[in-house]
């Protein structure tokens, strides 16, 4: 496949494949997390919890709008916020719409996609609809904290169930959202890309397509992350952050049950449309070899004969910055089978 060019990957010859062992260094996710904190926490963005509650409806000139709301999640036993894009025709008539669910990354929240420094993505979506590049859709951004959209070991903070059960029910009972997997797709960026892939892989009964920008593809053997004493402060921070999700020490079984690369090796993914991309200038390529992990996912899917789209963008960055440049590509892919 030509790098940087969209390519529909289909069947390939089977063969033995292994993840590069260097991914299991002691600095994999500790560095990811510490660098995410540094890059995501910027001036004017310190009090995320207050911002969640203060946001008012964003009204666009076309009549489209973004609403901010919350509901009680049984899976989390707490109230959770979300934002939703409603197209210009939503305010009149009785039309029902397909739904795109989109998951944010570490230290972001459900409001991040609407702020200037991330490209005012709601305006991009509205423009794409106006130009008939995608059909009219609802687009939902749930607050996911730093959960990797995974059920916690305590059995009470069940973030995967929150997305796959509570959120879908909330949207379909509150808004004119079409039900059924053919009308639901899921995307995300960074940690949210991880969540979108793994949820779609596990629950293709709920979602017909998935798209992930700069997805965090986890290392093969999580026990190697804390195998030595280097970067002890970062390891301690990582351990505390990830312990509720994967246990302390990390439970390899739970890890592989949620790792997109591991899931891609064993699950039947045929019938699920899959798109993912990353930039060769992604800050995590040098730090943790993110590009290697993503290319490994491409290779596994190809070897298993699972059709998918994989795009490598030359000299482009990580996360929302990449999304702002290529959301049109992923949305066009996700919405391809929706009725206009």
Model-predicted segments: where are they?
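N-terminal secretory signal peptides that target proteins for export/translocation
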Residues: 1-16
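Intrinsically disordered, low-complexity regions enriched in Ser/Pro/Gly/Gln/His and often acidic
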Residues: 13-16, 30, 248
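Bacterial N-terminal signal peptides
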Residues: 22-31
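Non-catalytic cap/lid and distal C-terminal segments of serine-dependent acyl enzymes
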Residues: 36-340
